Amino acid sequence: MTGPAPSALRPEHPVARPLAQLVALFGLDVRGDLDGVEVTGAALASSAVEPGDLYVGVPGRNAHGAAYAAAAAEAGAVAVLTDGDGADLAAAAGLPIVVTADPRAALGAVAAWIHRTEDNAATLFGVTGTNGKTSVVYLLYAILGQLGIVAGLTSTAERRIGEHAITSTLTTPEATELHALLARMREEGVRAAAIEVSAQALSRHRVDGIEFDVAGFTNLSHDHLDDYTAMPDYFAAKLELFQPDRARRGVVTVDSEWGHRLVEQSRIPVTTLSSVAGSEADWRVTVLEETLARTAFALEGPGGRLLETSVPLLGAYNASNAALAIVMLVESGYDLDAIGAALERDGGIDAYIPGRAERLSGDRGPVVFIDYGHTPDAFSSTLAALRRVTAGRIVMVFGADGDRDITKRAEMGAIAARGADAVVITDFHPRWEDPATIRAALLEGARNAVPERDLYEVPDPRTAFRTALSLAGEGDVVLYAGPGHEDYQEAAGERIPYSARDDARLALREAGWL
């Protein structure tokens, strides 16, 4: 690929396929004439339709997608795939209609057929877990690059084809977009791709039609209980990735009971990994040295196999993330010695992960990190890592998502108060919630945990970061947790431009530290 990355992640040279073949293959009902109708793509939103697309109308929270069939037809859609109710809504658009009981459940197989991704030659890695998914995906991508392999990725932060990046909107794309992306990667000669797989993606059929060569599991902790009523339900969604129709092999981090439970219930062969001393896991990772800039570690496997390297990231948890990436590569057929030689040549893993323990400061003043961590476990891991390598104070800035899991807020506040010397609570993405209500829950958790802790409530994130910076000096650390790579703040139905990274750099320059 030359020039800028495409705005649409689709193959440049799609092959038209007769829609009648799809109907016959899947035994679907038809309303209208399919004679001569050929499809080159599929779209789940009328705004994403391109000429030649099959428009897929599914029931939504507020409206049925089939109600927008006329707009899809105007954009160039050649047919509609929907359910019975949707067929009635789409009739006036004048397009042939293919009917199935559950169009979302059919979407992965349909998109795979349209884009011919069932015969994809690339090695596919799928990574799931509460924390660390994005990091492992980027570490896989980085190590593959150091091995000379043209790689791709899709993550919460961005989609990558080779060296070209496009901003993401979902952790895992809808099946229509994901299969189109894989087809484009095939055109670009991508030999391996790492895909971040959320629990919601598994529950909502976004990765249907894909068989991963290796699935990886990082951990499971409190999150998304607005989508899943209890932790066992959340776990069950993750477990779906470790089924024979999803993946050939798995690598599971067993540092928690959830990891052990996953090994017991997995229906594919799994290899285990642990950072716990004395563990009987197949692979064991041991931290050799931690600094604010890097973490050196040793990875020991079956038969005495050993690799020592480093990752340019803070914390033992990132050593575990890197180890998971390496073991996933080994399980897919890459040679451990070849991996070790490439990493030794380059002085360790050469990875940049946007918004994940990303250092923004220079050589003077406090050290400033921005991190996407937004769960109690992520807060705990990052603060513990900082405390081990920080001589001075830790000042933490954070908020919480509105209209998301409210049950974790008090615990987030408590962990921040226990782990930091000063805490600044601000607004993150309030969405339709009252921001003051969100801040109050975080403050209550912090006050109850450590009543004497220095707490500041500063609604505006720009002012909040500058407040944190005013509390820190040489030898101190400022951790801005939550915004990560994002360049907006979502409030009352609007996405307001705001990059915490850019603003932090500006504030550091204003203070004369950058």
Swiss-Prot record:
Q: Which InterPro entries match?
A: Mur-like_cat_sf, Mur_ligase_C, Mur_ligase_C_dom_sf, Mur_ligase_cen, Mur_ligase_N, MurE/MurF_N, UDP-N-AcMur-Glu-dNH2Pim_ligase
The first-level EC class reads ligase
Q: What is its EC number?
A: 6.3.2.-
Q: Name one GO molecular function term.
A: ATP binding
What are the record's GO terms for cellular component?
cytoplasm
Q: Which residues bind ATP?
A: G129, T130, N131, G132, K133, T134, S135
Cross-referenced Pfam families, in alphabetical order? Mur_ligase (PF01225), Mur_ligase_C (PF02875), Mur_ligase_M (PF08245)
Keywords in alphabetical order, please: ATP-binding, Cell cycle, Cell division, Cell shape, Cell wall biogenesis/degradation, Cytoplasm, Ligase, Nucleotide-binding, Peptidoglycan synthesis
Gene3D superfamilies given for it?
Mur ligase, C-terminal domain, Mur-like, catalytic domain, MurE/MurF, N-terminal domain
- Posttranslational mods: Carboxylation is probably crucial for Mg(2+) binding and, consequently, for the gamma-phosphate positioning of ATP.
| GO biological processes | cell division; cell wall organization; peptidoglycan biosynthetic process; regulation of cell shape
| Modification N6-carboxylysine occurs at | K238
Which residues does the annotation say bind UDP-N-acetyl-alpha-D-muramoyl-L-alanyl-D-glutamate?
L44, S46, T171, T172, S198, R206
* Pathways involved: Cell wall biogenesis; peptidoglycan biosynthesis
Compartments annotated for it: namely: Cytoplasm
Top-level taxon of origin = Bacteria
Q: What is its main location?
A: cytoplasm
**Family indicated by similarity:** Belongs to the MurCDEF family. MurE subfamily.
Q: Which PANTHER family match?
A: MUR LIGASE FAMILY MEMBER, UDP-N-ACETYLMURAMOYL-L-ALANYL-D-GLUTAMATE--2,6-DIAMINOPIMELATE LIGASE MURE HOMOLOG, CHLOROPLASTIC
Q: What does this protein do?
A: Catalyzes the addition of an amino acid to the nucleotide precursor UDP-N-acetylmuramoyl-L-alanyl-D-glutamate (UMAG) in the biosynthesis of bacterial cell-wall peptidoglycan.
Name by which UniProt lists this protein: UDP-N-acetylmuramyl-tripeptide synthetase
Which organism does this record belong to?
Answer: Leifsonia xyli subsp. xyli (strain CTCB07)
